[in-house]
From Swiss-Prot:
NDH-1 is composed of 14 different subunits. Subunits NuoB, C, D, E, F, and G constitute the peripheral sector of the complex. This is NADH-quinone oxidoreductase subunit D. GO terms for molecular function: NAD binding; NADH:ubiquinone reductase (non-electrogenic) activity; quinone binding. Belongs to the complex I 49 kDa subunit family. Its main location: membrane. SUPFAM superfamilies: HydB/Nqo4-like. Keywords: Cell membrane, Membrane, NAD, Quinone, Translocase, Transport. It is an enzyme of class 7 (translocase). It is a peripheral membrane protein. It holds the Pfam family Complex1_49kDa.
Length: 364
């Protein structure tokens, strides 16, 4: 008897694609033979746009790449410009940057884990994550007037100081966060059905993860101990005590659990930063028109999705000659075909969820 594979379009308007992503699935019955991501539906030409903007004008565009973790994007481009100019950022601004980036990491992971739970049928778990994420968004709103697209971290420091009562509000969130994690453990992590949908599905060895340039939680879930905050500390990250969560099998379960544990480590970093937060200015003395000397720089940071890098070339003018972003979500999405092969259609949703793509960053 002869069988024939068939093609199925998954997306671009499917609720589980986390944006406008189309996946062309080649199937043998319900088993995936090939999975081809089709991207570009959200392409806006950000790199070229930024080459026609001043350096300070490029910062808001980074918010609209990984819009779920915009603080890290702001930090990456700001530190790249600071490297070009040789600017020293005030101590208080450095600590505020760390606090904001780690809050942003927790908020992003809450969306990642919550969406994964919902994709597998756990609507209640998703609602819990969204409810708790609101506390972080309120902290952002009070600090900079925006819940998602911030433009808060800028070359030289941060846009404005923390308002009165903000630190106390942040400490209250951290105190409540421990209870939130306990709830997740009981409701989601300990759920046998949830475990069965993830354990042993789409494993990725450390060797393949490195060969495919996997990054962030996807890389560490395969057991590779690599986090830019530890391997190549930027800002003041070398002052904090935290662990890098690792997996062993690199399957869906490990990718989920690494992010759950990373949220706890981020909370640990924030607590230390609040305890050490000094007084002082929040912005270095910067010229009104930022005009770096001729040169080039590549600067990388560890954002929620993984390592994101900014390559900036200055020709001495007010605008960058070349502006390029290495996007973690784009790189991790390239693993989709390899991870999906041999598994069923229902597993594609879970695999995609554990890769945690955000299409604003993928398409850029």
């Amino acid at each position: 008897m002869q069988t024939q594979t068939y093609e199925l379009n998954f997306g671009p308007q499917h609720p589980s694609t986390h944006g406008v992503l189309r996946i062309v699935l080649e199937l043998d019955g319900e088993v995936v033979v090939k999975a081809t991501p089709v991207i570009g539906y959200l392409h806006r030409g950000i790199e070229k746009i930024c080459e026609n903007r001043t350096y300070i004008q490029t910062v808001p565009f980074t918010d609209r790449m990984d819009y779920l973790a915009g603080m890290g994007n702001n930090l990456g481009i700001s530190q790249a410009v600071e490297k070009l100019m040789g600017v020293e950022v005030p101590e208080r601004a450095e600590y505020i940057r760390v606090i904001m980036c780690e809050l942003s990491r927790i908020a992003s992971h809450m969306i990642c884990c919550g969406s994964l739970v919902q994709d597998l049928g756990g609507v209640t778990g998703f609602v819990f994550f969204i409810r708790d994420r609101e506390h972080i968004l309120e902290l952002f709103n009070r600090a900079c007037g925006a819940r998602m697209t911030f433009n808060y971290i800028r070359p030289g420091g941060v846009a404005q100081d923390l308002p009165d009562g903000w630190v106390a509000q942040c400490r209250k969130f951290l105190a409540d966060f421990k209870g939130m994690m306990e709830t997740y453990d009981k409701l989601i992590v300990g759920n046998e059905i949830f475990q069965m949908r993830l354990k042993g599905v789409a494993p990725l060895s450390a060797e393949r993860a490195i060969a495919m340039s996997a990054t962030g939680g996807v890389l560490r879930a395969s057991g590779v101990d690599y986090d830019v905050r530890k391997a190549d500390p930027y800002g003041i990250y070398d002052r904090f005590d935290f662990k890098v969560p690792l997996g062993t099998k690199g399957d869906n379960w490990d990718r989920f659990m690494v992010r759950m544990e990373e949220m706890e480590q981020s909370a640990r970093i924030i607590e230390q930063a609040l305890d050490q937060l000094p007084e002082g200015p929040i912005m270095a003395k910067m010229p009104k028109a930022i005009k770096p000397p001729v040169g080039e720089v590549y600067h990388r940071i560890e954002n929620a999705k993984g390592e994101i890098g900014f390559y900036v070339v200055s020709d001495g003018s007010l605008k960058p000659y070349r502006w390029h972003a290495r996007r973690a979500a784009m790189i991790n999405l390239q693993l989709l075909d390899e991870l999906c092969r041999g598994f069923k259609i229902g597993d594609v949703v879970a695999i995609l969820g554990t890769l945690d793509p955000v299409l604003g960053e993928v398409d850029c």
